Amino acid sequence: MKRVELEGIPEVRGTVCPPPSKSGSHRALIAASLCDGSTELWNVLDAEDVRATLRLCRMLGAEVDVDGEERLEATVSGFGDSPRAPEDVVDCGNSGTTLRLGCGLAALVEGTTILTGDDSLRSRPVGDLLAALRSLGVDARGRVVRGEEYPPVVISGRPLRERVAVYGDVSSQFVSALLFLGAGLGALRVDVVGDLRSRPYVDMTVETLERFGVSVVREGSSFEVEGRPRSPGKLRVENDWSSAGYFVALGAIGGEMRIEGVDLDSSHPDRRIVEITREMGAEVRRIDGGIVVRSTGRLEGVEVDLSDSPDLVPTVAAMACFAEGVTRIENVGHLRYKEVDRLRALAAELPKFGVEVREGKDWLEIVGGEPVGARVDSRGDHRMAMALAVVGAFARGKTVVERADAVSISYPRFWEDLASVGVPVHSV
């Protein structure tokens, strides 16, 4: 499905259950691989990015048996504190999470590990993370372009020290990589220098490690990791608020959506979509096992800081296209280091619907209006594809989304679920 055509409709109506959390699936697989024993993981996402992490863990010596489709059951027999050197280059595909967290795991290997990915991943900087590993005594090198380091990366040797500093303003995954490294070592102090972007994703890493018996003590901008992971026996990955957000947006713009299997008490940073949607004027109420989102017929522009929830930016931008007034999304400069430069991509694609968009270094402004159908390009980015589909679902006329298959990275059933709530979806 390279290209999808949508026909705009007045309202959506239906029920969806979003897929398992991509972020949670990555973290659970890695934590289980760091154990000496066996762990049963339930509700693991079956999507390209998570398959990349499965491949990484297996290449480092974990035995992973997988059963099911879409929502996997995975039995992981970990490699403990002694991952083996991979026999081949680790291909992380398009998964930045796999590559960055994999750098931390590679530092535990007695030998050399090479990690790479597709063209998009090889354009994403990892210099700050590699510099942190080098400060621990690890030989860590990337491809140098104009003073910055990019994949492929080559990592050899184990850490010689028990304290490390890392900048937190490019990617929170650099911090998470070092926390997993600390768990593998049994002890490490991680000092975060400067602003920590997307801190709730670091909180997810800490929560995962704590569920595996690792102590992580936070003192200001530092994290003290003590103890090695121990299998909890069984662990269930929660459903994904990032994926749920697109259907929250659909219900807010027009109609009513019932979204099952999401937890309003979750620590997932993208749960904030509920708060933002209410602020814009939609109704959201809790039901047993999920939420119901209902349009009130009018959305209003908001000013919102999404520094801690960057994956919500395309979703909020899609809603903003239908809101009265201006929506300003601030402190999201780190979006420029995602699969694509999402700020630039949104600023280029949304105007094709007839919407006015202004872009700054770390902000985006959208002037709401009456979008009309257009031919738009996801640029191979899964979140762009789904956000553009939200706009196309209500835009007047037909919308064509190019590179629609990008959704397979995190939500393989997205187009089927979109059709199930009344949006005419055609593969063209």
Swiss-Prot record:
Subcellular location per the Swiss-Prot or TrEMBL entry: Cytoplasm
GO MF term (any one): 3-phosphoshikimate 1-carboxyvinyltransferase activity
Disulfide bridge map: none
Pathway assignment: Metabolic intermediate biosynthesis; chorismate biosynthesis
Active site (record annotation): D311
Enzymatic reactions: 3-phosphoshikimate + phosphoenolpyruvate = 5-O-(1-carboxyvinyl)-3-phosphoshikimate + phosphate
GO cellular component assignments: cytoplasm
Summary of subunit composition and partner proteins: Monomer.
Known function: Catalyzes the transfer of the enolpyruvyl moiety of phosphoenolpyruvate (PEP) to the 5-hydroxyl of shikimate-3-phosphate (S3P) to produce enolpyruvyl shikimate-3-phosphate and inorganic phosphate.
Protein name, UniProt field: 3-phosphoshikimate 1-carboxyvinyltransferase
Species the sequence originates in: Methanopyrus kandleri (strain AV19 / DSM 6324 / JCM 9639 / NBRC 100938)
Taxonomic lineage from the root: Archaea, Methanobacteriati, Methanobacteriota, Methanomada group, Methanopyri
